[in-house]
Structures are given as C-alpha cells and as structure tokens.
C-alpha cells in the first residue's frame, strides 16, 4: 500500500503527491487519518510528477500540507445485498442510523461499467403500479426511467412512498432510495413514514444531504445505484428513487471549476452530458432483472431549457407532472393527465384498447378545459346538450383519477386501494361510453375500481 502526502487543499479538492512508481489510478480511494477522523478522497486526475488531484468525500476542515495519505488501491466500495435493507447509509456505505454494523457479505465498487449491449433486455414490459392515473396516462416500463416534476407540497414524497409500498407488497420487489442533496428533515420524515407504513424492510436508504461537501453529493447517487444493481443481478425487479437528480448535477458543477475545467453554458461543468450519461446508462434492464428509476427533477427558475433539466429529459421514458392546481381541488395523486407523458403509451406496447381509452380521457379533459371559460361567464345552461354531457363525464373522470393511498391511510382515514390495469381501463372506458351517466359525480371521488363507485352511489 503506497503512501503519499498532501501538497495542496482548496475547499473540497485536495492534491496529493505519491512516489513516481506508485501513483494511484483515477477513481481509486485514498485515506487520510487526521487525529481520530478518517477521511476518504477519490482520485479524479493525474497531474504528472506523481501528483494526483482528488475530491474529498467529507469535510476537508483541519487538513494540512504534509499529512500522510494511504492509497487503498481500489475504488470506493459499499455494502450490497439484503443486509442493506432497512438501513440508512452514507456515500461510503457506513451506517448512520445508530443500529450497528451492516453485516454485509459482499462489497462492490461504486464505479462500474454499464451493461453491455448483449446483456440488455429488449422486451417492453409494463410495470403495473396500481395507481390509476399513472397506469392509464403515463405507464411505466419495467426498467424505464421516470421523471417526477413537482413543486413543494404537491405530493412527490407521498407518491414515491406509495410506489415503494406497491412494488414491495404487490410485486415483492426491493427499492433503493438515494437522497442526493436532500434536506435532512425530509430524509428523517421519509424514514419514519417508511417505518410507520411497514415497508422499511424492503428498502435501502442512502443519504448525502445538502450540508455535505460536493464530493459526497456527487457520488451518493452511484452508491445507491450500485446497491440497486446487486439486486437486479440477483434476478429481481428493483425500484431506484433519486431525490433530487438536479442536485447531482449541481454537485458536479461545484467541483468542476476547482478541478481546473473551463465552465460551459450557464456555468455548468463541460462534462455535464457525460456525467449524466454515466449514471443513467447504468440504470437499465438486463436479461436477469430490471432497475426502474423514479427521479425527482427540480427545474431551476421553471426554465425547462436550462442545461441540467434539458440533459435529464433526454434520458427519461416517462414524465409525471404533479400540478398545484389539481392538488388544490383536493384530487390526490395530483398528477396532471394532460401534461404527463410516456413513451410506452403506444398501441404496439400497451394495446389498442388502453391507448384509445387514454387518448379519449385526454380529449374529454381537454374539451372541459376549453369550456371552463364559457361556464365561468355564462353558466352551464348556455352549453349545447353534447357539451353538457362532455362536462359531466369530464368531472367524473377527474374525480375517478383520484385514489386513496395505503401510505396516506394515517391522515385520510380511508383504506388504500390497489387497482389493476384491467380494472382501470374498464372503469374509464365505461365512463367515456356513458355507462355511468346516471351516477352522481361524488360517487367517483376517492374510490378504487369502478365497482366501488357503483356501490358508493347506492349509499349516497
């Protein structure tokens, strides 16, 4: 094990000098012992003359020139496998939940090659989430990538938790949650909500919060991804949640200038597309299993042409847009059915009936949107009979898109519902074809399948 010494410290970037014949490789982990604290550095560049430039995975406070640095001769390695379930870990895979050692049987390096072309699975299989609006309007593909766009308080976290719960219970799948540059409070809330919903033993949590140095936030997504890859290679369907993918990019921006790179557009790192690609290309399905990822996306200043969200868009198969307008109507999940899209919504993938139903629902809701102004000024009576029918059906559809969640039982008091895709299509098709025109619209609010709406109408 070669030993070097620190020659320069600039914020999170540390230069270390090694003997010429023992220079560490790029991405190797180095270790500094400073008092009783151990700090891990990751090699980013070889500057020549035995000097390497590294990023610190923790705070570089208290480092000084001349401190000895050991080369671990391998990249950062983290625990993988079932031992990680129900635990909270940091970027290095160390437990931060005060529950003792992880007790893992295996450790994997966080830098891995994406699966080769031959290993990739080409089947376009749908992942049934049991959430009506998602299954109908923006279906997820097994091994697909989903962007969850939404402001504060419209339900990103609750939607994520419901997805984790449904995958865990209905599909006996595992989930990995990577909190990248998250608020510590949110991470804490999330952990306790997972415990209360009894799904903690099906999910591994990896956190690198906002207060951590950029090196930590830049690598924590890879730590979570590595754990997900292990489950995939065991033949499982895994869900990988990344919250927030924008902060992964931001961490790269923070260290880029310190590493001596010229900034590109809007001050982002010149390697933006490549860094995003390295992460996203590993999130994929192979012939053994699949990784389906749900990524929360923050859009700076609501500008979708900003380089960061624009680069993210290129990789997504589906976008789920949460709308404050819909949330204010009391309709949860507050997914906007007209704004959310999916590459899977294609008759060749989902079948003609599903496609026609989804497009029919969209056209009715779109027509209702256009008629709203007329209704606001002149009232319902001025509409033609045909338009009155469209409005009545649109309002039923709007309410039928809501659904009680299992993870929200605590505060809604309504038992959660999982709705199969078959029942979802049957329900919306029936409303569109006028089979339920005689039922009052409140019968459709917060129910599971259409049969429940019919039962509810009898009690009203």
Swiss-Prot record:
Main location: membrane
Listed GO CC annotations: plasma membrane; proton-transporting ATP synthase complex
Localization (cell): Cell inner membrane
One Pfam family it belongs to: ATP-synt_ab_N
Keywords: ATP synthesis, ATP-binding, Cell inner membrane, Cell membrane, CF(1), Hydrogen ion transport, Ion transport, Membrane, Nucleotide-binding, Translocase, Transport
EC category: translocase
Binding residues annotated for ATP, in chain numbering: 150-157
CDD domains registered for this protein in UniProt: ATP-synt_F1_beta_C, ATP-synt_F1_beta_N, F1-ATPase_beta_CD
InterPro entries: AAA+_ATPase (IPR003593), ATP-synt_VA_C (IPR055190), ATP_synth_F1_bsu (IPR005722), ATPase_a/bsu_AS (IPR020003), ATPase_alpha/beta_chains (IPR050053), ATPase_F1/V1/A1_a/bsu_N (IPR004100), ATPase_F1/V1/A1_a/bsu_N_sf (IPR036121), ATPase_F1/V1/A1_a/bsu_nucl-bd (IPR000194)
Membrane topology reported for the UniProt record: Peripheral membrane protein
Superkingdom classification of source: Bacteria
Task performed by this protein: Produces ATP from ADP in the presence of a proton gradient across the membrane. The catalytic sites are hosted primarily by the beta subunits.
Family: Belongs to the ATPase alpha/beta chains family.
UniProt-recorded name of the protein: ATP synthase subunit beta
Species whose genome carries this gene: Cronobacter sakazakii (strain ATCC BAA-894) (Enterobacter sakazakii)
